[in-house]
A protein has these predicted regions:
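Acidic (Asp/Glu)-rich catalytic clusters
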Residues: 24-28, 47-58, 84-96, 138-142, ...
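Bacterial Sec-dependent N-terminal signal peptides
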Residues: 1-19
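Boundary/entry segment of secreted carbohydrate-active catalytic domains
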Residues: 17-59, 63
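Aromatic-lined carbohydrate-recognition surfaces of secreted/lumenal glycan-active proteins
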Residues: 34-39, 150, 178-203, 255-258, ...
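Acidic-and-aromatic substrate-binding clefts and catalytic sites of carbohydrate-active enzymes
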Residues: 36-47, 68-81, 155-160, 197-206, ...
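Substrate-binding cleft and catalytic face of glycoside hydrolase catalytic domains
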Residues: 20, 55, 59-73, 82-199, ...
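Aromatic-rich peripheral "rim/lid" segments of glycoside hydrolase catalytic domains that contact
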Residues: 19, 23, 119, 140, ...
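Short, acidic/polar
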Residues: 40-56, 129-137, 203-214, 303-309
Length: 374
């Protein structure tokens, strides 16, 4: 009788533990499962979302809080309150914390690259401003933030360098300097280049060339973040896989960052450039109440297909991160046109896991890892 009771208790405990397993547990020892957080989520204003975050993810990135426009809106005046809270949340929950992003042409404070007359500053002035910003921010979180998106979106679709203010003033040297400045202040932090549209052949080649150039000059770069902004048609999974292989072969880790998949129709291509906005058109907002079953099935099948790809390349991929917790969090509700209702993330608006997530949690999505690329 006693033995039967113990067996029953053990069985119930196993079932309960199985029920509480999250995405991070299902991919344990394959790659980190990450998610982007808002300030409100860090402040625990939505306790049910907090539980999802703690259960399913072991890596976090701030959606906006650590961008330069938020951290240093005026030269020399840093606002660390929200960033401190974000980092503290990660430390309390033993998560791998990502800093996003140190140098980016967008969401950049107006003063950063120009003087009081609005003219480009000299190369020396910009170098000093870059160094002061990077080393103040990285230095504050030394040993706490484990990886930094050092430079974000500096390469165009044709593989050339984006003609940003940084490039106008410093040329491609601005990228080298950003990585150097970050490494100087925290030699143990991982340093990444992050960009969208990485499935494109010319952009892929441009990023590989960038990585090889940094390595040739003995400048530390640990990984490439492939922003996973997807749709029901783009990107082509075979081309996406080619990029994973290319970046891994260049000698860096690969991360799937900012992963989401729009379920809505598009007439403007696959851009994730936040300046590429459109006027609202109801034609491109057809699912205001719910997602039709057929569209939902297609969406989940495609998300599962990509997740299987990530598992297959888990010897090259170190992290897979969703760009938000649930559908209501997604930036795609307001990009490229504001006021749409999209269904882009792993959890629904009522915080239920999508079918492809359920399959992962039930152990039904598995893929043997390929040998690590040399």
């Amino acid at each position: 009788m006693c033995a039967l009771l113990l067996l029953s208790l053990a069985s119930n405990s196993y079932a309960q533990a199985k029920k509480m397993r999250g995405l991070k547990d299902e991919v344990k020892n394959r790659f980190l499962m990450g998610v982007a957080l808002t300030d409100a989520q860090v402040a625990d204003r939505f306790p049910e979302k907090t539980e999802i975050i703690k259960r399913h993810f072991n890596s976090i990135v701030a959606e906006n809080t650590m961008k330069s426009g938020f951290l240093q809106p005026r030269e020399g005046e840093f606002n660390f309150e929200a960033a401190d809270a974000f980092v503290e949340f990660g430390l309390e929950n033993k998560m791998f914390i990502i800093g996003h992003t140190l140098i980016w042409h967008s969401q950049l404070p107006d003063w950063f690259c120009v003087d009081s007359d609005g003219k480009n500053v000299s190369a020396d002035v910009l170098k000093k401003r870059m160094k002061a910003h990077i080393q103040t921010v990285v230095g504050r979180y030394k040993g706490k933030v484990k990886g930094w998106d050092v430079v974000n979106e500096a390469i165009e679709g044709d593989g050339s360098f984006r003609k940003s203010k940084f490039y106008e003033i410093l040329g491609e040297e601005f990228i080298e300097l950003a990585f150097k400045y970050a490494h100087e202040v925290d030699p143990n932090a991982e340093l990444y280049y992050n960009d969208y549209g990485m499935d494109g052949e010319k952009k892929r080649d441009g990023v590989v060339a960038l990585v090889k150039n940094l390595k040739k000059k003995r400048i530390r770069i640990d990984g490439v973040g492939m922003q996973g902004h997807m749709g029901l048609v783009h990107p082509d999974i075979a081309e996406f896989e080619k990029s994973i292989n290319a970046f891994s072969s260049a000698g860096v880790k690969v991360m799937i960052t900012e992963w989401d998949m729009s379920a809505l129709p598009s007439a403007w291509g696959a851009s994730a450039n936040i300046s590429d906005t459109q006027e609202f058109n109801a034609k491109y907002n057809p699912y205001t109440e719910s997602l039709p079953e057929g569209v939902s099935e297609k969406w989940n099948a495609r998300m599962e297909e990509f997740f299987r790809l990530f598992l297959r390349h888990s010897n090259s991929i170190s992290r897979v991160a969703f760009w938000g917790v649930s559908d209501d969090d997604s930036w795609l509700n307001n990009f490229p046109m504001r006021g749409r209702t999209d269904y882009a993330l792993a959890f629904s608006r009522d915080l239920k896991p999508k079918p492809f997530v359920e399959k992962i949690l039930k152990g039904k999505v598995r893929e043997k890892a390929l040998p690590k690329t040399k």
